[in-house]
């Protein structure tokens, strides 16, 4: 039984919260980390803390994504671990939703995931090794009122991950989708004192991602649901 090992990670849609927790965990495990976001100014402190490198990229633009992978390859190494954390939202009564806002939400949540995954897979297939992780949400499996665009994007991302897992697992690429069913704790958003641990801790989520990455190929997870102990489902 062999535990997979990874050397270079690329986190797309990086920011504070889960992405930061993942960057810290991976850097502690001696994995080189690249962070990608539309605006990288916000990533300065995290890069200083973890030794990660930041790259500007619009994940919905095919040329930008191809350029991103080229930059990471030249300046760090070819990623053998890719995490897609980006998501887009547009909320409101169904008849009030602007088509352009809906299209953008779907593009960020799902189409960007396709573009990033395609570039990753092209590089992983020759070595028959790699992992691609997608961050989903409650909306990956449940469409909420006045949140159709988010559900559309997250449903599509889940379908992408499932299709990829079925095609690519036999070729040595571990594809996994995570349903984050609940609010993630942050400095700006935390639970009430009388409801301890009623929100997801980003460090705990990152640890679950890591546990999936350590799975031997004889027992791979393709989807994992994570929620606080008091979350109804």
Residue ranges and their predicted role:
Residues 6-7, 78-79, 93, 124-137, ...:
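Active-site loop of short-chain dehydrogenase/reductase
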Residues 15-16:
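Conserved glycine-rich cofactor-binding loop
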Residues 29-45:
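Conserved glycine-rich Rossmann-like NAD(P)H-binding loop of the short-chain dehydrogenase/reductase
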Residues 49-63:
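Rossmann-fold cofactor-recognition segment
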Residues 88, 95-114, 133, 157:
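Catalytic Tyr-X3-Lys loop
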Residues 117-118, 162:
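A short, exposed helix-loop element centered on a Lys and neighboring polar residues
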Residues 131-156, 161-162, 166-169, 184:
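Catalytic loop of short-chain dehydrogenase/reductase
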Residues 170-185, 191-233:
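C-terminal helical subdomain
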